[in-house]
Each structure stands twice: as structure tokens, then as C-alpha cells.
Amino acid sequence: MVSKHGTASSAQAKAEVDARTESRARAMLDEAASLAPASTNGDAELADQLSEKARVAWTKNGLLIPSTKLAEEWGITRGALDQAEEGYEVFLLKIRGWLWAPAVFAKLKRSAVAKVCRTMPSADEVSKLFFWMQPHGALGRKTPAQAIQAGQLERVLEIARGLAEENGWGHAEAN
């Protein structure tokens, strides 16, 4: 039986699986973005349907995990996760009546996720998800999660602040 922390080869295998999952997630985000029609009143219903279809796909393909799983991974109660969401420390997506969280959050410290999420409190959930999943040139083509894992939290915060300022998403608190 392999220990919880595994061996070097199991760590490498997990890293490869994580990389493939992240690659599929980016492809899904790109596909969803290409399907989204221009926003007009006549297209609003179609956009909602496409958005819902994409969101359901994200739950099936591992981009999102149930919020209860994130709470468990972070060692907190579901109520504490709700409070974190109210404090802009995390964001959740409601899909078909259930709350889902970005799977990458489970790989990161709660405090790091909170610092980044608080920089853009008024951004919509999909914009936040795209921020977390897209590689950024300023991060050496890494996603914010990859950059944080590589010790670049401060750089991720700089980029998040700039994006929030550019889009008028405001700040919940100074970081």
C-alpha cells in the first residue's frame, strides 16, 4: 500500500495527470468562450443555455469539484466555506442547484486563494474561473495556480490587482 504522500514515481504520475486535467480544462474554457454569442437581448437566452451547458461539462470533466469536497480538502466545514465566499475569499459556481468550486483550489493553501480572490470581489464567477485557468504571459505562461505553487504568489496578486483595476472589479481589501 502506498502512503498518503506516495513515492517519487507516484508524485510524477500525479503531476502528469494534473497537467493533462489542466490542459483539458483550458481547452474546455477556450471552447466555451468560442461558443458564447455576442451579448444582446435577443441572444440572452441562447447565451444562458450555452453557459449552462459549458458549466455542466466543467463539473463532469473535473474542472470544478463539489464545494463540499473543497471544504473537506481545506479541513473546514461547509458553513465556514460559505463564510469564506461571503468574505470574497473564494468563489463558488451554482450549477443545477449545487455549488461547485474550481478544482485547482484544493491544491492550494486557503490563505493564498483568499488573497487572490479578494483582489477582484465584483468580478463574475466565470471571469474569475478564466483568470485562474488561463496561462498568463506575465507568469511565464503558467496559470495562477501553477505560479502560486512555484512560489510566485506576490506576482499573481499584482496581475489580479491590475486585472481588477482594468475591469472595474474593485478590491475587497488591501493585500
Role assignments for model-derived ranges:
Residues 1-175:
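Non-transmembrane "mature" sequence context
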